[in-house]
Amino acid sequence: MTSTIDLDTPAVPEPDRPDDADMLDIMRRMVDARTWSTRMFNLQRQGRVGTNAPIDGSEAIVAGAASALDPTTDWVFPQYREQYALGRFGDALLDGIVLYNMGHPDGGRYPDDLHVFPYSISLATQIQHAVGMAWGMKIKGDPGCALTFFGDGSSSEGDFYEAANLAGVRRAPVIFMLINNGWAISTPVSKQTGAESFAAKAHAFGFPGVQVDGGDPLAVRQAVAEARDRAVGGQGPMLTEAVTYRLGHHATADDPTKYQPAA
């Protein structure tokens, strides 16, 4: 598993180290994400918004990945918890989160220049959408790539296998960002797959897979930057498995104390 966290070496070797402004932006996105996530959780408990999924534990993955993308050419297809850390693509996302969870139709209506698709509650559907977008970009000769976030549980859905197979066949410029947070609601990873890692599954589709420390935003950024270079260079897809741990609830509708071991 790739990580840049090593007390005996520089955090990120030159020339891959982002400048101070980028590092501060990543940190700000992570703090914003946890703040917004906590606020939305509390609002749900007050009965002021509907069910929502906290991002706690995945902030570094999303902020790190977003920092490696170009918001003017690349497209992001999130699941239901990443928007909190995607402010780099546009602040309208945060307005959309609040409106969506209040049941307002404008919550799923993003500005035309925002390269983030509205999230889907149905598991893994956004993976197929990302591959379709990436393939279309390739056909039209558009610059950039598509990146889709999904969880370990979504990798058990048929949509994932169909999308990954098509992406491999068509060499679509897409990045599969699998967030392995240890749990698919209450199902642990040990009961989710018999594979050595989720990253290893990529080889069956004809493209590489890597595993990265999901608590290390710079390692995630570096992995996504390499995957992006591969995608826009015409070499096809890549799967990046970011390993982290879900801190608390899957969503406001469940009770993790019923299945997660006590800390």
Where are these regions (language model features)?
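Glycine/aspartate-rich loop-and-adjacent alpha/beta segment that forms the canonical ThDP
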Residues: 2-12, 230-263
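Loop/turn elements at helix/coil->beta-strand transitions in domains of secreted/extracellular proteins
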Residues: 172-173, 235
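Short, proline-centered helix/strand-breaking motifs
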Residues: 173-175, 208
